[in-house]
């Protein structure tokens, strides 16, 4: 309740259960599609740890994801490569470095990794080598997103293992429910068709457009036109 007041938010019962799971477990996975409140949970747990003067480290696999994490939480986030002081030149170098990498323990009471679906097995191994005993690890991501470019499907495999406490957030919150991008992402994932123009409401954002083309060539030209 105190954290809710501090950051002026309201937590659903499922989000409160997620906070409890993080407090009760050393490793927790938070998964869910866009607009389901993952960021709200992250902001709340950060506030709780800040109140207790505990050290929290935020990170993500790419620069863009780290920047977005900083913007949404108000706390500094870094890329995993920067946090772990590693670099990738090519896959052969990465494999060689993987055998030699010892890592330096990360000084943190809580480590939160966002966009875990983008993390491959090499990067995950580096991270695990650098975690102090007793440090809590929160892994956040959408298991329905495409897996990492590198080897492995870390997030989905960890969930399927059943060895790690996993909370699946599935409620789309009011603000997110106004976005047709988010609504249609969930509909496609459920095997449903896109919302049509006729199904728009006064509250629905015009942020999703369906463009019909008559052939593959026309479709490719349209994509090129939109991107240039």
Which residues fall in each region the model found?
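Pre-P-loop entry segment of helicase/translocase ATPase cores
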Residues: 1-20, 90
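Conserved helicase motor core of P-loop NTPases
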Residues: 18-21, 144-228
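P-loop (Walker A) phosphate-binding loop of NTP-binding proteins
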Residues: 22, 33, 61
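Conserved lysine of the Walker
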Residues: 38
């Amino acid at each position: 309740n105190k954290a809710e007041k501090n950051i002026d938010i309201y937590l659903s019962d499922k989000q409160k259960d997620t906070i409890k799971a993080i407090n009760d477990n050393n490793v927790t996975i938070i998964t869910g599609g866009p607009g389901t409140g993952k960021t709200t949970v992250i902001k709340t747990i950060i506030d709780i740890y800040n109140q207790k003067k505990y050290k929290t480290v935020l990170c993500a696999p790419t620069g863009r994801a780290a920047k977005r994490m900083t913007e949404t939480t108000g706390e500094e986030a870094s890329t995993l490569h920067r946090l772990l002081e590693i670099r990738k030149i090519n896959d052969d170098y990465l494999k060689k470095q993987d055998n030699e990498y010892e890592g330096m323990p990360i000084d943190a009471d809580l480590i939160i990794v966002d966009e875990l679906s983008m993390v491959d097995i090499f990067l995950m191994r580096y991270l695990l080598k650098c975690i102090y005993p007793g440090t809590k690890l929160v892994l956040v991501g959408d298991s329905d997103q495409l897996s990492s470019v590198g080897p492995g499907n870390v997030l989905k495999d960890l969930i399927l293992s059943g060895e790690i406490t996993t909370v699946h957030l599935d409620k789309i919150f009011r603000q997110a429910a106004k976005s047709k991008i988010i609504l249609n992402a969930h509909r496609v994932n459920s095997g449903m068709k896109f919302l049509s123009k006729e199904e728009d409401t006064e509250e629905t954002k015009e942020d999703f457009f369906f463009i019909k083309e008559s052939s593959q060539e026309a479709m490719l030209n349209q994509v090129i036109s939109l991107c240039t």
